[in-house]
From Swiss-Prot:
Pfam families: UCMA
Source organism: Xenopus tropicalis
Primary location class: secreted
Subcellular location: Secreted, Extracellular space, Extracellular matrix
Function: May be involved in the negative control of osteogenic differentiation of osteochondrogenic precursor cells in peripheral zones of fetal cartilage and at the cartilage-bone interface.
Cellular component aspect of the GO annotation: extracellular region
PTM annotation (4-carboxyglutamate): residues: E71, E75, E84, E88, E91, E92, E96, E98, E102, E103, E107, E110, E114, E117
Signal peptide start and end residues: 1-26
Top-rank taxon, per record: Eukaryota
InterPro entries per UniProt: UCMA (IPR031386)
Gene Ontology BP annotations: regulation of osteoblast differentiation
Gene: ucma
Protein name per its UniProtKB record: Unique cartilage matrix-associated protein
Length: 138
């Protein structure tokens, strides 16, 4: 009889143990409207790379290894385009400054011409012909 009791207690303990494990697993499963799968996906994206990144991962060179011709060409293209942009910028600035200086000189000439003309009109005595008629055609 003792043997039957031990067998019964062992089976009962196993059933209780399996029931506890089943409840534990079902509690670990999340419901569908839970936002946790998004976290799982973001964690997955942090751990795993995209295919394009993974293919380039092993192609990356070390710090001391020589550059490939493609890298050298790409760097030269970037350098040349930066130089061209810088050249265009400074040329534009120089043209704007030259235009500004030219306008200032034209305004100054206009003002001085007006002042000279006013002075001549004020000092004209009426006896000799006016300055306008004394201009020499070159």
């Amino acid at each position: 009889m003792k043997r039957n009791q031990v067998l019964f207690l062992t089976c009962a303990a196993a059933v209780v143990f399996l029931a506890v494990l089943h409840v534990g697993e079902s509690a670990a499963v999340r419901s569908k409207d839970d936002p946790a799968p998004d976290k799982k996906e973001s964690l997955k994206s942090k751990i795993f790379m995209q295919g394009s990144e993974a293919s380039n991962f092993f192609k990356k060179r070390g710090k001391r290894s020589p550059k490939s011709q493609d890298e050298i060409n790409a760097e030269n293209r970037q350098r040349l385009s930066a130089d061209e942009r810088r050249r265009e910028y400074y040329e534009e600035q120089r043209n704007e400054f030259e235009n500004h200086v030219e306008e200032e000189q034209d305004e100054q000439e206009e003002r001085s011409r007006e002042q000279i003309e006013q002075w001549r009109q004020w000092h004209y005595d009426g006896l000799s012909p006016s300055y306008l008629y004394q201009r020499q055609n070159i």
